[in-house]
């Protein structure tokens, strides 16, 4: 409850928001900007023509109901939409309101709501795993097919946890072959998840008894969790000026809006980081996966940059702020020249040298 309201705040879209299960039938897709004050501060020094923040795509998918794995409530369609995403943001109702309908009963119960979704996703994954296991077992039995044996090993591990009512993300594989096959299965419960506890305004800062229940579960699962008041975020989004929004947040005792916190959490959930390019034309944030090396990041800008990579000139963001210009950073000896093995760090200001 509250996911379409949150989606509207995140994307400035206007998806229909209401208190019944199938308010959203077709998925609404929005592009959200990742808040990053480093870009603004760099722009104050560089004075670029424009600032280009990093973006993520967010999809508002209809709420699932019990029986979705068997196609009930348009379940097959909704589960197919989830399969196409990289991560799941699970919005849970954590507030009392007699005027808002709850599927399956009147009492607010976010734990039960979570378990309903988990069960439907697990059942769908189990269906996928059993189908593939039957197929791969036959191939493995015919001859010495190494790929099929890897597949069987992965599928049996998944089958064991899913039958216990656990999620596929509980399973970790050591070999690259197993990891690759597991990834290509696109299991629903293998996706990273962020639980968003939608609370009332009075609980926006510290949460409540309902969000505390979800916090315990999230901790046991090693999952991320966030407390947010969707209706309050909607009110904040309707304010015209930055000053008005900050004043509203201060009155609630919050340093940062829930929408910004949610976007940052989602970005981290996907294991994403940002490197920056800064010049007269633009200051731009580029998204890459944590652990990527310089040539891979160069390829984010253009494939030719990766193919013909020579070296990367790197300035740490804090050094740029301290010295006030690229020239001053160079003069202070704080600009480093990095090769192909350099692991790019979040906030690095990069300039790539390449030859094609």
What are these regions (language model features)?
Residues 1, 7, 135-343, 350-356:
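C-terminal-of-GTPase-core extension/linker across diverse P-loop GTPases
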Residues 84, 345-346:
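Short, flexible surface segments
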Residues 82, 126, 130-133, 152, ...:
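Hydrophobic faces of stable alpha-helices that mediate helix-helix packing
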Residues 24, 77, 121, 128, ...:
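Alpha-helical initiation/capping and key positions within long helical/coiled-coil segments
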Residues 1-102, 111, 118, 130, ...:
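Conserved G1/Walker A P-loop phosphate-binding module
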Residues 25, 92-128, 219-237:
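Short, exposed interaction patches on small structured surface elements
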Residues 64-70, 106-108, 115-121, 140-146, ...:
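Flexible beta-alpha connector loops of hexameric P-loop NTPases
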Residues 18-19, 100-105, 207-209, 239:
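Short amphipathic alpha-helical segments
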């Amino acid at each position: 409850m509250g996911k379409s309201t949150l989606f509207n705040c995140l994307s400035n879209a206007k998806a229909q928001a209401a208190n019944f299960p199938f308010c959203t039938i077709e998925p609404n897709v929005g592009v959200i900007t990742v808040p990053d004050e480093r870009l603004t501060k760099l722009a104050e020094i560089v004075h670029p023509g424009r600032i280009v923040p990093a973006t993520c795509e967010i999809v508002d998918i209809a709420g699932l109901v019990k029986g979705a794995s068997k196609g009930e409530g348009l379940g097959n369609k909704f589960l197919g939409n989830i399969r196409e995403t990289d991560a799941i943001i699970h919005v849970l109702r954590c507030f009392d309101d007699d005027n808002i309908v709850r599927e399956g009963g009147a009492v607010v119960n976010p734990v039960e709501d979570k378990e309903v979704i988990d069960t439907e996703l697990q059942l769908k994954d189990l269906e996928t795993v059993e189908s593939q296991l039957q197929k791969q077992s036959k191939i493995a039995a015919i001859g010495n097919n190494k790929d099929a044996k890897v597949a069987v090993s992965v599928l049996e591990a998944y089958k064991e946890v899913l039958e216990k009512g656990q999620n596929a993300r509980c399973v970790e594989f050591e070999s690259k072959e197993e990891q690759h096959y597991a990834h290509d299965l696109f299991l629903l419960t293998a996706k990273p998840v962020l639980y968003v506890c939608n609370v009332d305004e009075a609980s926006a800062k510290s949460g409540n008894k309902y969000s505390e229940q979800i916090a315990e579960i999230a901790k046991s699962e090693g999952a991320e969790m966030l407390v947010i008041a969707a209706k309050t975020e909607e009110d904040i989004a309707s304010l015209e000026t930055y000053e008005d929004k900050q004043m509203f947040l201060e009155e609630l005792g919050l340093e940062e809006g829930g929408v910004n916190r949610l976007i940052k959490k989602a970005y981290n959930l996907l294991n994403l980081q940002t490197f920056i390019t800064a010049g007269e034309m633009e200051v731009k944030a580029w998204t890459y996966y944590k652990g990527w090396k310089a040539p891979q990041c160069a390829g984010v800008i253009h494939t030719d940059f990766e193919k013909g990579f020579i070296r990367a000139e790197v300035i740490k963001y804090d050094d740029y702020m301290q010295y006030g210009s690229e020239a001053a950073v160079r003069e202070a000896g704080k600009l480093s020249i990095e090769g192909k093995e350099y692991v790019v760090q979040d906030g690095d200001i990069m300039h790539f040298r390449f030859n094609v």
